[in-house]
Amino acid sequence: MKGFAMLSIGKVGWIEKEKPAPGPFDAIVRPLAVAPCTSDIHTVFEGAIGERHNMILGHEAVGEVVEVGSEVKDFKPGDRVVVPAITPDWRTSEVQRGYHQHSGGMLAGWKFSNVKDGVFGEFFHVNDADMNLAHLPKEIPLEAAVMIPDMMTTGFHGAELADIELGATVAVLGIGPVGLMAVAGAKLRGAGRIIAVGSRPVCVDAAKYYGATDIVNYKDGPIESQIMNLTEGKGVDAAIIAGGNADIMATAVKIVKPGGTIANVNYFGEGEVLPVPRLEWGCGMAHKTIKGGLCPGGRLRMERLIDLVFYKRVDPSKLVTHVFRGFDNIEKAFMLMKDKPKDLIKPVVILA
C-alpha cells in the first residue's frame, strides 16, 4: 500500500508498505478524511520525539472499517468510524490510575505517527477496536467529523485541565485550531470572560464565533501587560496554553491570579526547559497550579464529542479553511500546514 511518510528528520515522501493485518481485537480502516497537524510538523522538522525512519504520518482521521479481528464485537466492515488520535491499550496500570493517554509509558497512548504507522496510508491499523473506535453518524459531514479525533479533544482537554468555574475569566494563549476549540470548551464550561490571544484575522474571527469576549494581539505589546490592563491588574483565573514557544509558559504564570491554574495542551517541540518566573510564582508559594496533558482518546471520549457535534452544541467545521480531494493531495495539505499562510486554520483531505 501507499503512504505519506517521515523518511527521517526533516524529510518526507511517499513510500510503499505492506497492508497491515489485524490482531484478534483490532481493525483495519480505510481513511475517508484526514487532516495534517502541527504535531506532525514538530515531529518531522524539529525532530521533537526523536528520529523516525519511513514512518507513515498522520493521526487525525475518520474512516471505513475494512477488516476486523475475530474478537471484535461492535464493528464490522463497511462501518464509518471516528478514529481517535490517542488509541490506548486498555489493559494497563496507567489506565487503572486514570491516565489512559500514557498506557504503557509516558505518551504511549499516542501511537499513530509516533510508535507505529499513522493514518496517511491507504489503510491503517487500530488496536483494541471495540474500545477505541466510535461510530460516525451519517448526518455529520466528513469535514466536521475529522476535527473530532484531535482538535476537539485536545482543545476541550485544555478547558478541562483549567478547572473553569462558572463566570471565571480565562485566557487562551494561541488561537490556532486547538486554541479555538479551547475557547469553545471554555464557553461550554461556563467561563464568563474569555480572552483570546492571537493575531491572524481568520483566527480572530473564529475565536469570536466560538465565544471569545476579548482579543489580545501579541504584536501590539507584551501579552501579560495587555491582559493585566484588561483585567485592571487582577489577572485571570485560568490560562490555557494552546500555542507558542517555551517562553509562553512564563507568560501564563504571570497572568494567572494566585490560586489560579495554568493548563497546557501545547506540544513544545523545542527547548530543554520551560521557564517559571520566580516572583510571579510567589517565590514558589502563589498556589498557582501548572497542569499539562495529552488529549484523551478512546471510544467513550469520541462518542461524547460526536454528541456535541450531532446535537449542535459545537460546530468544528468552522476550523476548516482548506479542503483538498484525493489521496495524492495529502502532501499538499501537509506542506500547507507547515507554511501556515495567513488564511489557514486547518486543511482537510477528503478521500471518500
Swiss-Prot record:
| Co-factor requirement | Zn(2+)
> What SMART domains does this protein's entry cite?
PKS_ER
Tell me which EC number(s) this protein carries: 1.1.1.80
Name the positions where NADP(+) binds. I175, G176, P177, V178, G198, S199, R200, Y218, V265, N266, Y267, K340
Catalytic activities = propan-2-ol + NADP(+) = acetone + NADPH + H(+)
According to the record, cofactor stoichiometry and binding are noted as: Binds 1 zinc ion per subunit.
Cross-referenced PROSITE patterns: ADH_ZINC
Q: What class of enzyme is it?
A: oxidoreductase
Q: Which UniProt keywords apply?
A: Metal-binding, NADP, Oxidoreductase, Zinc
Q: Which InterPro entries match?
A: ADH-like_C, ADH-like_N, ADH_Zn_CS, GroES-like_sf, NAD(P)-bd_dom_sf, PKS_ER
Q: Which cysteines are joined by disulfide bonds?
A: none
> Single GO molecular-function term?
isopropanol dehydrogenase (NADP+) activity
Q: Which residues bind Zn(2+)?
A: C37, H59, D150
Cite the record's note on assembly.
Homotetramer.
Q: Which family, according to the similarity comment?
A: Belongs to the zinc-containing alcohol dehydrogenase family.
Q: What does this protein do?
A: Alcohol dehydrogenase with a preference for medium chain secondary alcohols, such as 2-butanol and isopropanol. Has very low activity with primary alcohols, such as ethanol. Under physiological conditions, the enzyme reduces aldehydes and 2-ketones to produce secondary alcohols. Is also active with acetaldehyde and propionaldehyde.
Q: What is this protein called?
A: NADP-dependent isopropanol dehydrogenase
Organism (species): Thermoanaerobacter brockii (Thermoanaerobium brockii)
Q: Which gene encodes it?
A: adh
